[in-house]
Amino acid sequence: LALVIASPLIEQYVSAPKTEPLTEFFVLGPYHNATYPYNLTSGDVYPLYLTVDNQLGTQARYKIEMKFRDQNQSGPDSFNHTQSSLQPLTDFTFEVPEGQSAELQVNLVFNYAVDSLRGESILDEIVVNGTSVDMDGMPLPWDSEANAFLGNIFFELYLYNDATGTYQYNQRYVSLWVNLS
């Protein structure tokens, strides 16, 4: 009986943990799992699935910027919570209702040629969902430790800020290293 009387008092002090509003962002490989392409073949199609899960408490407007870099260029910085200074190759904008997820399929084709004399892989273009992005013959140097011509494809997440009327970096990105040999 004492417990029944005291339960409203106890409820004030012991309640379910409050969840913090957040956005989850992840990438899945061609088979909708964590099997990602690494050793790429020029001209082949590599599907990726980007998923954004909105747990912000309200509908949200997002933008994903796709970028590519070699080992010497800087990417996003997890410790300083900053995005990469590289220009995006393309972007995707969309809205996600509260408590729901959006999945974007991104089909990528890397067109490149290996220059054995110079010890580089020359990236001519990346085709994103059928649209060509000129990479201007971007050289990817040989990495003797990885035994590969490494490039990094990454996607940065931005959230629309109604107060400023701009998209702001949401401190979330996904990244895949690929070998263009």
Mark where each language-model region is.
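Helix-rich terminal scaffold detector
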Residues: 1-8, 114
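Membrane-interface segments at or immediately adjacent to transmembrane helices
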Residues: 6-63
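Short aromatic-acidic-glycine turn motif
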Residues: 21-28, 32-35, 68-90, 164
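Internal, hydrophobic beta-strand segments that form the core of beta-sheet-rich folds
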Residues: 65-67, 120-167
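Intrinsically disordered, low-complexity Pro/Gly/Ser/Thr-rich segments with frequent PxxP/GP/PP motifs
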Residues: 81-125
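Short beta-strand elements
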Residues: 163-181
